Amino acid sequence: EAAAANGSDHSAGLCRSQPVTQSTTVGLTIAYLVLFFAALLGNSIIIYVVQRHPKLRTTFNMLIVNMAASDILDVITAVPLSVAYLFVSVKWFPGGFGVFLCKLLPFLAYLSMGASVLTLTVMTIDRYFAIVRPMRRPLSKQLTMVAIILTWLISGAIFATELYKFRLFNDSGQVICAPRWVENIQDSHKITMFEKVIRFVLLYLVPLLTMAMFYSKIVLHLWKRKAPGVHIDKNQKRIEKQKRKVVTMLVTIVTLFAICWLPAHVNHFLLMFNLKVHSCLPHSLILTFYFLTHSNAAINPCLYLVFNESFREGFKHQVYNRLSRGNFNGSERLSTTRAEAFSATTSYNSLLSTKHGIRRDFGSAACRTML
């Protein structure tokens, strides 16, 4: 579509399309399989651990569970499409069920991406009020549920166009699944260019700038509290340390999200605005761009376990229970101290319990057309 939209004269200067090599196909297939099972297992563990332990069911962890759910949706929709593309390109199967999946799978893959970045934004704002403005009421569980539902509804509204534009075409006797807004290819390409820019701004640029602004304020606030001459008692030091670990985890997640999705956005813009340069990129490089975007789904649960002692301890106890075939007893429960330390950064009641101790300082992330 992009080549046709640029006209035959411009297309004459394009680099010749190179087929996917067998080594690239095998290598990426293995990588995608590892990614699929790692992301599915890791995010399922996060959801299970939170569900099993009442002390971990904080508003902040509800957002982490939402992130894990969106990552699972990403790998079960986008990974099969990406692997299929390695072997059959955009070929599809005919019939009503073929039309249904052609529209549904791209929509769900995009939906998960939008829900992830919006959830990250909500988590950032939640941490800002919990750390910088603790006297203001943070998100309640009811408001958190509303925020979670909104992340999916807003993402669904933004990407609802996938349900319209993806359709089946007959290309030289082969059925393919591809997006097209209108029958005229040039007009469809212009609409797609506008669409890519809007999505980049709404679901990449604006959220990242928003998160960068809030995290800058959080880091500045924590740095001031750590300055020499600022007296903090032992219990407050423990809570402050846990807050810093949570912020470090979130900043790492946001940074990796930005890094993982940037190459795909660059690829989209080259495809839309500079087809000549895009056509000269090695096919294996473009496919690697998209693998990088989905690898984010497997990295996130690792970060939760690395930075969060409560998650790690909950996971260890679950493994111990399975191996010993026993149920939790008093000695096997989560460490109350660690769980409360983490909850102190995410729970309104815990924030109120530290109110007097900080009174003097309280003002302060399948084919070129699909992905």
Residue ranges and their predicted role:
Residues 10-19, 88-106, 111, 144, ...:
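Loop architecture of class A 7-transmembrane GPCRs
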Residues 73-83, 157-160, 164, 205, ...:
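Hydrophobic alpha-helical segments of membrane proteins
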Residues 73, 84-87, 112-122, 129, ...:
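Fourth transmembrane helix
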Residues 179-189, 200, 220-264:
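Intracellular effector-coupling site of seven-transmembrane GPCRs
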